[in-house]
Amino acid sequence: MTSIAIIGAGTGLGAAVARHFGAEGFAVGLISRNQERLDTLAEDLAKDGVRAKGFAADVRDPASIAKALEQVTETLGPIEVLQYSPLPQKDFMRPVLETTPADLVGPIEFSIYGPVAAVHQVLPGMRFLGENRGTILFVNGGSAVKPGRNVTGTSVAFAGQAAYAQLLNEVLGEEGIQVSQLIIGGRIIEGDAEKDPAVLAGHLWDLHTKRDRFRHQISAD
């Protein structure tokens, strides 16, 4: 059995992705900062027949991300899919003229250093799985492609992450590893035809299985 590692796993999109991939036979590694919440989520997923386990890590600490991903592999099996989708902190979102150099440190650690550390950790295992197996999924808000003057930190950092993801797509595609980005404009809304977590999880599954595009965007704002 292979696994999906979800960095930024929570009760919304993360849980929906866990259920979707779990139903397809994946074990699920849940990664976020709060171990207690992860344990509760894993218990809920188990009721639906999903084999899941939580591993606490801070995305702004590359060593903790690497350790958590190593534990996923050791406990649940090789990581076939990595999803990077942590929710940015509210203090990352400041107006452009009020944003100082210090204000950008957190967003850049969160949205660039974190995924770089994660990718470096999972790549050897994905290469070992062979061509057309491994997938790296990035989930971003609309500011990744349309910067907002009042959310400067995430606009700058998400743009950097998007560039990194596209470069990975170009290079790793030659090795049969898919790299894709799901852009979700606005909030995730339960029951919405486009932005319900289960609907979005379906798009992420399609990006993994169809392997035919870099970016899928849900609304512009």
Name what the model sees in each region:
Residues G10-G12:
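Conserved glycine-rich cofactor-binding loop
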Residues A68, Q83, P107, G114-V122:
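Hydrophobic positions on the long internal alpha-helix
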Residues G25-D39:
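Conserved glycine-rich Rossmann-like NAD(P)H-binding loop of the short-chain dehydrogenase/reductase
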Residues P88-Q89, P101-I108, G114, F128, ...:
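Catalytic loop of short-chain dehydrogenase/reductase
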Residues D48-R51, Q71-Y84, T209-R213:
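A glycine-rich helix->loop->beta "capping" turn
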Residues K67-E74, R94-E98, A102-F110:
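Active-site Tyr-X3-Lys motif and surrounding loop/helix of classical short-chain dehydrogenase/reductase
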Residues E36, A56-A68:
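The beta1-alpha1 cofactor-binding region of Rossmann-like NAD(H)/NADP(H)-dependent oxidoreductases
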Residues A163-Q166, G173-D221:
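C-terminal helical subdomain
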